[in-house]
Amino acid sequence: MANYFEMTRDELTAEKAALEENYKKFQAMGLKLNMARGKPGPHQMDLAMGLLQMTDYTTDAGTDARNYGDLEGLHEARELFGDVMGVKPEEVFVGGNSSLQIMYNLISMGYCFGFPESPCPWSQVEKRKFLCPVPGYDRHFAITEEFGFELISVPMTPTGPDMDVVEKLVAEDDTIKGIWCVPQYSNPDGYTYSDETIDRFAKMKTAAPDFKIFWDEAYIVHHLTDEIIETPVLLNECKKYGTEDRVFMFTSTSKITFPGAGVSAIACSESSMKYICKRFSVMIISYDKMNQLRHVRFLKNKEGVLAHMAKHRRRLVPCFDAVKTAFRNNLIPCGDIAHWTDPKGGYFISLYVMPGCAKRVANLCKEAGLTLTGAGSAYPYHKDPQDSHLRIAPTYPSLDEVETASELLCVCVRLAVVEKLLAEQA
């Protein structure tokens, strides 16, 4: 392999022919590979099968978990999530299996009713806006798009969103009602917000009195190294500045136990807790407390969660390493055609290919039997201005499948880049 940017047109043409020949070999294999979504693989979910042996239905206080009641969640479950999230049990609301559903419910709540500090429901705010760090989580963006918010992109950095941009925007525009954040091992870059970034979120001035930070701790215990990274707890930091009502923290066991049968939680201020309980009480009497109790009995406490996640780590690290090894071996020798993140946790690797090539790479992969998240999906309205970013999710396939998929992906990246370089020389 040689640097593509130093090749003559004849050399690039020969390289294209060789890559096309290799690509056809992958097509002939009849592959059905998927690295599109951040799903746990069967080997991870198998680790939690002990949950199904938890048949106890009586809480430590003698409550029958089979019955109605305890809208905020079982006390034991609130203690468990408070331990994991670093907050008090009374600041935790434990819900059903989907934290995304609770996020949707809270956006809907703001839209229909507003929050206690809102001058009016968000639905009555013309040209309402929401900040979206990019690249970010497509399902977050879809919720606020569904409710008619204009989505404003904010650049991500290795220490979190560009806070100079965030602070300027929220200080000047009272129609900006919130921001989406994945503060630990962000989706998709795998970045963790710095202490300074978290402090700035807590103390920043906002023109909107009802500005909300949707703080999604989806990967709070999803470490890929022996280093257990812990960051300041935003809710606790906000208390120092009297801004605790601006934050909703979320987490769930979706990528700890069973994605379709886990438990989710919100952490928020006392005032916010009273308000959301009032609104939720009209919608539901209680969530699945039997499942909450099963999770408490199985995971026990934060130490139990971390011990369980260490088993996940041992199974996931080889898959992440396989992707990065393929990138190093197959892309670096070709020159500056791509770069990628090296996350210490989470579920994704961000691959940035030469601008103008991401859609072509994704299409080439699809035609050879490898499904990736659509190019541009990590940006509002699925529009990546550079057409450069691809989110790689190596968690669900087997290690052999990840290795094959990574080799195919590299062929597709190189082929797309060579095609573009030849087109530019035409």
Where are these regions (language model features)?
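Short, solvent-exposed loop/turn segments at secondary-structure junctions
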Residues: 38-42, 99-100, 136-138, 159, ...
